[in-house]
């Protein structure tokens, strides 16, 4: 886990970056460093409230993200999902359970892609096959931004 922050205005931001297993698992010997990728979530904070940009993929990463948001001391008002891949929204449920007044939002195109990622072809044959029991049981889709 790595975090960076800025505090140059009334708004400030913090970034949480997590290293996770990549999607390619059959690399040649000696290229193991290429078997991981980084995911990040950005918390944009005002005086009392915050907006989170993207969640993380696995149950463990989602708990790390939730703990990080709670530790900020801010009220999570919204979660903006930037695109429809599971590694950007599979962590919604735990955050929305802890912050029930928060809204998860995305563009209509992203919401459509999120629904596709939850289809059996993607969820069972891709995400759960690659990440086994690491994917959260409860998965949610964001509301369309108006």
Residue ranges and their predicted role:
Residues 60-106:
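Active-site metal-binding motif and surrounding structural segment of the metallo-beta-lactamase
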Residues 54-55, 84:
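Glycine- and other small-residue-rich loops at beta-strand/loop junctions that grip anionic moieties
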Residues 49-51, 78:
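Structural motif
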Residues 21, 87, 110-112:
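Surface-exposed, flexible loop/turn segments at secondary-structure boundaries
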Residues 1-48, 57-60:
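Zn-dependent metallo-beta-lactamase
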